[in-house]
Regions:
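Generic structural signal for short, solvent-exposed loop/turn connectors between secondary structure elements
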Residues: 1-4, 34, 166-172
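Active-site signature of cysteine proteases
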Residues: 26-27, 176-395
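Acidic, low-complexity proline/glycine-rich segments
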Residues: 32-42
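Active-site nucleophile-adjacent alpha helix/oxyanion-hole segment immediately C-terminal to the catalytic cysteine
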Residues: 40-268, 353, 358-360
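N-terminal Sec-pathway targeting helices
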Residues: 2-17
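Membrane-interface motif at the C-terminal end of an N-terminal transmembrane signal
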Residues: 20-34
Length: 395
């Protein structure tokens, strides 16, 4: 019998503990996320509309889906306008938005939530105020970083601001300190850069190369406690700029998207992806007829295997979910097309920013019922709207 020395036993024990911790930290979530992975899907999709868009990106460990989605949307607008698309720096947009959010935090004496999230209009607001950079000029990957990782940056920035607002009088140079902290994590923003043999600033690149006009776009949302077709401030944590949205009835959300797609316009979309009917691993989102508690083991096992019946959502149910925080503004994606399953049921083709590690290489198929239930907001070109909608919202 082989006898182990005390040091060897300690090493083995530590190794077992480490492996156990790694399993619980990474193994169990992976198993949970992939509990249906061995069941072959029976979905068959036929594309009806698939509009031009750039490649799927990976936002990494950063809550910048709004910037990835908003800039993907602008890249598709370049394609629609007959321009050669360029990958717009998502982190430049996010960085400038973080500065604006910090300014509002300070103006409100700390009375504003801070975080990495944002709304789609932030992309347009940054474009309007600062311009834009290509990814080749500013990746936001500093030092040896190969992907976005804000886990250290965000707490540090928030701590800086919390200390700042407790200081009286307010330091006049606080923005310099904030910018220096951003530089330390993301790298300095170049004042000028070369792109395809020509020198640009962020302003001239936005105007001359990308060429969109921020005022040509409209943001829409749907609530029942505000007048329809009137602008209102959507009170969600990531609307830190307190921008307004035009309010439309729930039933109009999918009609508006359908019209836009038919006219050749893509749509940027913010939504809630915390529901059990959303599965990134399967590339699907729908509204199950039953809750998970009501499902049998077999029904749970086949939730994303074949097209399932959906529960019809009412405007009252949608509003209740928004008010009780069942629906939250936790993600943004880019609607680029329309498809039917083998039974003729329509799905939107949606581009995500979580890389390509799902069955549809980074895209998802989302039912109209899910969109009606879980939409927070839409952003699209004004010309994508029907005349009667444009008239009602006085565009």
């Amino acid at each position: 019998m082989i006898r182990m020395k005390k040091k060897q036993w300690i090493f083995v024990l530590v190794l077992v503990l480490v492996l156990t911790m790694l399993f619980y930290r990474y193994g169990l979530p992976f198993i949970h996320r992939n509990k249906y992975a061995k069941v072959k899907t029976q979905y068959e999709f036929t594309e009806i509309i698939n509009l031009g868009c750039t490649s799927v990106k990976q936002q990494g460990a950063s809550n910048t889906c709004w910037s990835y989605t908003g800039n993907s949307f602008l890249e598709s607008e370049m394609i629609r306008m007959g321009k050669k698309p360029v990958e717009i720096s998502q982190i430049y947009t996010a960085r400038q938005a973080y500065l604006g959010r910090a300014q509002n935090f300070v103006r409100l004496h700390g009375g504003l939530s801070m975080g990495e999230g944002g709304q789609l209009h932030d992309v347009l607001n940054v474009f309007r105020k600062y311009g834009a950079l290509p990814q080749s000029a500013y990746s936001g990957l500093y030092g040896n970083n190969t992907y976005n990782d804000f886990k250290k940056m965000t707490p540090m920035l928030n701590s800086l601001l919390k200390v700042l607002v407790k200081t009286k009088p307010l330091r006049s140079n606080w923005e310099e300190s904030y910018q220096a902290a951003l530089d330390a994590h993301l790298g300095k923003v170049p004042e000028t850069f070369d792109y395809e043999g020509k020198k640009y600033t962020a302003r001239t690149f936005a105007d001359q190369v990308i060429g969109i006009k921020p005022d040509d776009y409209v943001a829409l949302a749907s609530v029942t406690d505000q007048p329809f077709y009137e602008p209102f401030v959507l009170l969600v944590p990531d609307n830190w700029s307190f921008d307004s949205f035009y309010n439309v009835p729930m039933e109009q959300l999918t009609n508006i998207i359908d019209t836009a797609l038919q006219r050749g316009f893509t749509v940027a979309w913010t939504t809630d992806v915390s529901e059990n009917g959303f599965s990134w691993q399967h590339g699907l989102a729908y509204v199950p007829q039953k809750s998970e508690d009501e499902m049998s083991k077999e029904e749970l096992k086949t939730m994303f295997v074949k097209p399932m019946p959906e529960r019809k959502i009412t405007a009252a149910e949608r509003q209740a979910a928004f008010e009780n925080w069942q629906t939250t503004d936790d993600h943004a994606m880019h609607i680029v097309g329309l498809a039917n399953d083998q039974y003729g049921r329509p799905y939107y083709i949606v581009k995500n920013s979580w890389g390509k590690a799902n069955p549809y290489k980074g895209y998802m198929y989302v039912t109209k019922e899910f969109v009606r239930f879980k939409t927070i907001s839409l952003l699209l070109h004004k010309d994508a709207l029907e005349a009667k909608i444009k008239t009602k919202v006085t565009l």
